[in-house]
């Protein structure tokens, strides 16, 4: 009996050694297996609180396809190490869901690790990424940039020993702040010296990529969260990467969006059969319940804004009086404090303005 027990334990050990891990973590990211040879990398925010987009990894017969390259090259390098911990196959394709830099600033890390990599985006998104290469350094170098100002405020609070509300920091908090300030300076230096890499392959509307027998479908939905939002779908596995068409971090990102066009896109997304869905930011989903909630939010905001426009109210009056707080309970898990600040800004200010412009035919 003792021999059988030891044999059983040895078998368990050998099995564990030969099976890929379902979750692998490093200091600021978690890579989770979501299908056979398919992984999602979910990142913590950078220390300047700018979010990294989620990254997808699809392993084919001979090569790997990666979806989005996050905000910082250093984080992308760490992602590459995570990928190399599960496969020795090279990354052949890097695909972008849209042009926003929190999804592609890290491209240089992939180009350096895999010099022959094919970098793919929708045609117009590629042009926007080229613009990133022109204005990015100017934006970051500006003395009043968000990155500079937030670091200056952090350093001032540290020097004063208390925050803007007068709360005095503990010794533990001071040590944590000192570490954060060092990290922030390193990140800022990284951004100041960022090399924006342009896509070297573009497509219009749709593109199918075969990784051996695995089919990967890219579809451009046009205007939604950005001018051109692309989803990546694995029909065999029913796995969808939504990009920022869907974000739960904790609420949708609505700046520079097109709500009138976004709504029908969400309705179409709901029709796609899924077992797993990786959002642009936020937790992994396993059905369309969150898609439905975002669609209901868009429908409600558009309906209420249009009603107020017909009543003759100005944009400022609409922003001051519209109320969609009934929609967030139990969905976005927002604290009462965040409800007064973040939710109010993202929804009442930004989304309402974009909806107002869309309805009036003024873009947005």
Residues of each region from the PLM?
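C-terminal regulatory/interaction regions
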Residues: 19, 310-364
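Core dinuclear metal-dependent hydrolase active-site scaffold
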Residues: 33, 177-180, 192-198, 202-234
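Divalent-metal (often Zn2+) His-rich catalytic cores of metallo-beta-lactamase-fold enzymes
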Residues: 239, 260-317
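Active-site HxH/HxHxD metal-binding segment of metal-dependent hydrolases
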Residues: 85-199, 208, 303
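Conserved beta-strand hairpin/beta-sheet module of binuclear metal-dependent hydrolase folds
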Residues: 32-82, 230-242
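Active-site neighborhood of phospho(di)ester-bond hydrolases with catalytic His/Asp-centered motifs
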Residues: 67-69, 92-100, 120-123, 221, ...
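Hydrophobic h-region of N-terminal signal peptides that target proteins for export
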Residues: 9-18
